[in-house]
């Protein structure tokens, strides 16, 4: 199986980091130019092409520009595999420099939405192959759904004897994603893992989805996992 690197902007550090993580995860590295997306005509065609090629994960190197990022977000909304954004604002970070492993610390915000628990699987894979510590940033809600989701993720990872801790956020589920960039200095992650929006609401259409905000303001790579209705039962 393969990890695919789509390059809209080319930075050697992006490529080096993506290749190291691919090697660490025991996958084959494959690289294409972003123009390949236009050859598939639509999102469904792109998804089918990835399936035919046996791609398990995508890296996307792109300029830190909201229209460019949104174009890739739109293209990836139907994907059933994780995808990682690497923007030019991340290219000088120590995490992208030469080091033994690509990941030491992974930050994953957790909201009240049930699909958050699906991140457990990819967090487990990343931690198992890289040895990275997982930090769950639990939304500060009045209800207990975010706490319940964070607890289920922690239990899943703990059963595999993987390092995980829960940190309480300052904001609730509606705003915790926008807290993520400001917490990168004190929590020092090497990657952020987010659940993409189910559907875009009016605020998302006017101001952009929360995941785009994180990507535009992040100083480390950002991985997105699309919510999948057929997997919501995992959260019951």
Language model features with spans:
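Short acidic/Ser/Thr-enriched loop-to-helix initiation segments
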Residues: 1-28, 94-137, 143-160, 231-236
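Structural motif
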Residues: 5-8, 38-40, 60-64, 109-112, ...
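Extreme N-terminal leader/targeting regions
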Residues: 6-57
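Short glycine/serine/threonine/alanine-rich loop segments
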Residues: 27-34, 55, 81, 132, ...
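Gly/Ser-rich helix-loop-strand patches that form or flank binding pockets
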Residues: 45-99, 183-236
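Glycine/small-residue-rich hydrophobic helix-like segments
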Residues: 149-199
């Amino acid at each position: 199986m393969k990890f695919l690197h789509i390059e809209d902007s080319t930075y050697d550090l992006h490529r080096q980091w993506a290749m190291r993580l691919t090697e660490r995860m025991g996958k084959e590295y494959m690289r294409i130019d972003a123009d390949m997306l236009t050859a598939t005509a639509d999102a469904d065609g792109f998804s089918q092409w990835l399936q035919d090629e046996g791609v398990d994960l995508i890296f996307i190197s792109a300029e830190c520009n909201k229209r460019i990022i949104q174009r890739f977000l739109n293209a990836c909304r139907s994907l059933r595999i994780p995808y990682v954004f690497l923007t030019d604002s991340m290219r000088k970070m120590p995490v992208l420099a030469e080091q033994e492993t690509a990941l030491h610390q992974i930050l994953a915000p957790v909201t009240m939405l049930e699909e958050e628990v699906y991140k457990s699987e990819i967090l487990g894979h990343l931690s198992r192959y890289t040895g990275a510590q997982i930090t769950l940033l639990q939304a500060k809600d009045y209800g207990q759904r975010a706490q319940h989701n964070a607890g289920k993720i922690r239990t899943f990872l703990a059963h595999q004897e993987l390092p995980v801790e829960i940190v309480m956020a300052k904001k609730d589920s509606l705003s915790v994603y926008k807290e993520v960039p400001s917490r990168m200095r004190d929590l020092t992650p090497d990657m952020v893992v987010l659940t993409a929006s189910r559907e875009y609401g009016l605020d998302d259409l006017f101001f952009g989805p929360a995941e785009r905000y994180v990507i535009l303001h992040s100083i480390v790579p950002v991985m997105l996992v699309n919510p999948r209705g057929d997997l919501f039962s995992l959260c019951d």
